[in-house]
Amino acid sequence: MAAVGRVGSFGSSPPGLSSTYTGGPLGNEIASGNGGAAAGDDEDGQNLWSCILSEVSTRSRSKLPAGKNVLLLGEDGAGKTSLIRKIQGIEEYKKGRGLEYLYLNVHDEDRDDQTRCNVWILDGDLYHKGLLKFSLDAVSLKDTLVMLVVDMSKPWTALDSLQKWASVVREHVDKLKIPPEEMKQMEQKLIRDFQEYVEPGEDFPASPQRRNTASQEDKDDSVVLPLGADTLTHNLGIPVLVVCTKCDAISVLEKEHDYRDEHFDFIQSHIRKFCLQYGAALIYTSVKENKNIDLVYKYIVQKLYGFPYKIPAVVVEKDAVFIPAGWDNDKKIGILHENFQTLKAEDNFEDIITKPPVRKFVHEKEIMAEDDQVFLMKLQSLLAKQPPTAAGRPVDASPRVPGGSPRTPNRSVSSNVASVSPIPAGSKKIDPNMKAGATSEGVLANFFNSLLSKKTGSPGGPGVSGGSPAGGAGGGSSGLPPSTKKSGQKPVLDVHAELDRITRKPVTVSPTTPTSPTEGEAS
């Protein structure tokens, strides 16, 4: 009978268990038949079952829910898979195709409970948007967080990418045909969460935080501020998180594309305006520098599982911005506009943040150093093909002797032409390797120098005829040729006469004996 009573007690609700057990017929029978000892044992058993039922009920309410989802959308190469793999702590991975599935382990340290959060990554090609039906349906919509990923290394694509993928989500949600009442509740919940955001301050409790398991009805009806004119104008009914990846490229944009602080403030202001329209949060991350990766995970579990976080908004660091949903407004965005110098807040995003011109990089051909022996063999073959050349200048082998050089020595001249003394043997000889033109000039120069430097008509000199009329006419007192009587004028006349003689009578030389004229004159 006692066993039957305990089974019945297990099936009843915990609040009514003690009254049913003690006041019912079974309780009266036990109290009257078995005495006080049996009644005391059954009372202890009742208290045990009450504790067990109470603990089970508490655990069922505080247990981490299953079936939560995160949907990532963005362009190809934006870093969607890299971001989730970094959160998981996996360094090496392979990128999926179409619709990729991953998961995040969620652990509640306070309750020692854990679960898995489903992660769906849609391909950057719009061709695959039909696969959203497997990750986002009417049942899982209210348990889903949408993450829009933007590549900050290409900021000129940021705004178009956000608008494109947000419209894809809106189009898919409209196709789900959610009942209007349910959709209205989801939208109101998102508005309520946005309005009730409280920024963590210094007075934030430092004790270990527990998940917020209170229902909406348990919350007090506190007065909230109305939404701004541009806030939640595109309410999807589900939380949205905008993640800007590759923020380490900001320094590259400054160096290579001349971006300044006002450009980054301009980009941030437009992204924050977009986030206001969808009630989204904004986080700047960098997988390369491991910046704000943990913050993304904390924000996900806070939105889906109610985990608290104590991280305030960050807007000072341009590469580590964090703006939770509900913190931002138009006035705070206007603070960025105060730093504009050459830009204006009303400028179009596409006119200011433009795609830089594509630079054609000319890749120089890499020069590979070949083996020394191979190089020497090639060099030897090239040298073998070339004809041998003389070490000096080519020798002029023609039998032509430079014109104007006298060949016949000791010739008699007329009385009015002075005799020419031969060039001494010690004079400079002409190099036979010199060209013909250079040789002729050298011979003439030596010839004229000898005429000007030597005294012509010396006593007993060759080439003077004793019986010439000029000798008789000159008188016998001096015994000198007439050319020596006027030393200042006569040699000049002799030079002209000699030149006339040279031009009238060319000299020929045997080809076998290319002897220089100076040597012939000296012989």
Curated annotation (Swiss-Prot):
GO molecular function per UniProt: ATP binding; dynein heavy chain binding; GDP binding; molecular adaptor activity; protein-macromolecule adaptor activity; RNA binding
Binding site for ATP: G74, E75, D76, G77, A78, G79, K80, T81
UniProt name for this protein: Cytoplasmic dynein 1 light intermediate chain 1
Keyword Phosphoprotein in annotation: yes
Organism: Homo sapiens
Protein function: Acts as one of several non-catalytic accessory components of the cytoplasmic dynein 1 complex that are thought to be involved in linking dynein to cargos and to adapter proteins that regulate dynein function. Cytoplasmic dynein 1 acts as a motor for the intracellular retrograde motility of vesicles and organelles along microtubules. May play a role in binding dynein to membranous organelles or chromosomes. Probably involved in the microtubule-dependent transport of pericentrin. Is required for progress through the spindle assembly checkpoint.
Compartment(s) of residence: Cytoplasm; Chromosome, Centromere, Kinetochore; Cytoplasm, Cytoskeleton, Spindle pole; Recycling endosome membrane
Family: Belongs to the dynein light intermediate chain family.
Oligomer status and interactors: Homodimer. The cytoplasmic dynein 1 complex consists of two catalytic heavy chains (HCs) and a number of non-catalytic subunits presented by intermediate chains (ICs), light intermediate chains (LICs) and light chains (LCs); the composition seems to vary in respect to the IC, LIC and LC composition. The heavy chain homodimer serves as a scaffold for the probable homodimeric assembly of the respective non-catalytic subunits. The ICs and LICs bind directly to the HC dimer and the LCs assemble on the IC dimer. Self-associates. (Microbial infection) Interacts with human adenovirus 5 hexon protein; this interaction probably allows virus intracellular transport.
PTM statement from Swiss-Prot or TrEMBL: Phosphorylated during mitosis but not in interphase.
InterPro entries hit by this protein: Dynein1_light_intermed_chain, Dynein_light_int_chain, P-loop_NTPase
Residue positions where Phosphoserine is found in the record: S207, S398, S405, S412, S419, S421, S427, S487, S510, S516
Superkingdom as given in the UniProt entry: Eukaryota
Stretches for region Disordered: 1-25, 387-434, 456-523
Lineage: Eukaryota, Metazoa, Chordata, Craniata, Vertebrata
Stretches with biased composition (Low complexity): 9-19, 412-421, 506-523
